[in-house]
């Protein structure tokens, strides 16, 4: 009984530790989004690269249409 309880507590602790580490390891991304009616990501990625965004971008589809979001290398100035 004690072994099972210890295993459960240890497993739970390791899972929480992994969740905390994974959130710390992935920095927040910043995007410059333009509503252009995109449908797929490849044309949007090429558009972002041609506009000077080295990481490209992705097309996000919302209820009001497609939005091309270019990946910024750092947080934009306010």
Curated annotation (Swiss-Prot):
Cysteines joined through disulfide linkages: 33-70, 38-59, 44-68, 48-69
A Gene Ontology term for the protein's cellular component: extracellular region
Subcellular location: Secreted
Domain of life from the UniProt record: Eukaryota
Signal peptide from the UniProt entry: 1-25
GO biological process: defense response to fungus; killing of cells of another organism
Keywords, alphabetical: Antimicrobial, Disulfide bond, Fungicide, Plant defense, Secreted, Signal
Family of this protein: Belongs to the DEFL family.
Entry protein name: Defensin-like protein 90
Organism field: Arabidopsis thaliana
Taxon lineage: Eukaryota, Viridiplantae, Streptophyta, Embryophyta, Tracheophyta
